[in-house]
Amino acid sequence: MRKIFLLSFDDGTIYDKGLVELLNKHQIPGTFNLNSGLEDFVWEFEGREVLRQCISDTVEQYRGHEIASHSLHHHLLTCLDDDTLRWEVGEDCANLRRIFGVEELGFAVPFTACGDREVSILAPLVRYIRLSEFREDFALPADPFHIPIHGLYNDPDIYNRIYDFSRSTLPVALFVMAGHSYELEMLNHWDYMDKLLGYIRSFHFECMTTMEFVNGFYPKR
């Protein structure tokens, strides 16, 4: 039985650097979903400013990990018309290809809303779509454009969820853990994350990037 474990972190803030260091320590690859049009955007979380990074300066930082699109400006996709939706993701992918020298990119949905219209428009532009929808079971999605989330790193029951995953009897089981690196800083979760990654590693799951998973289980047509 194979158990595939993916880590998917959104927004591309300066705190990704610390998360990459933790992932490297535990030899776990991650997928980092970036917005190339928001480098100067600052917002507050828990009363502190969250700082984004200059993406063009992060090529070495993310080496050994995957970068994916999170749209250009992190808009709610269901509020965009068809052409704007294509541009938001297509332009972001073009920027990331130029900066990182990659050919294929996946996409992680900003916020939570992404319906059939959005999937049908975006599927020709990207290799896969990671949704923001939660799924209880660990079965593989029917296609690479409906990849769910199985837990956030700071969910109260995340340890139990991971343990349940380790006991799955499916021939191939999938667990996608998501989050934001700025939460590690603002909530002082660095030590917590270090221990959680060690717990994940103790099960000897097949930890891989989202693109590695998609290419391995969903051949191109």
Region spans (language model):
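Boundary/entry segment of secreted carbohydrate-active catalytic domains
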Residues: 1-15
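C-terminal domain-boundary segment and adjacent tail
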Residues: 2, 25-27, 31, 97-98, ...
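Glycan-processing catalytic domains of CAZymes
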Residues: 8, 69, 130, 134, ...
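Short beta->alpha connector loops
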Residues: 11-14, 110-114, 153-154
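A short acidic, amphipathic alpha-helical/loop segment
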Residues: 18-22, 117-121, 161, 192-196
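Metal-dependent polysaccharide deacetylase catalytic core of the NodB/CE4 family, i.e.
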Residues: 26-117, 124, 135, 140-146, ...
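Non-membrane alpha-helical structural segments and their capping/turn regions in soluble enzymes
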Residues: 82-87, 156, 187-190, 194
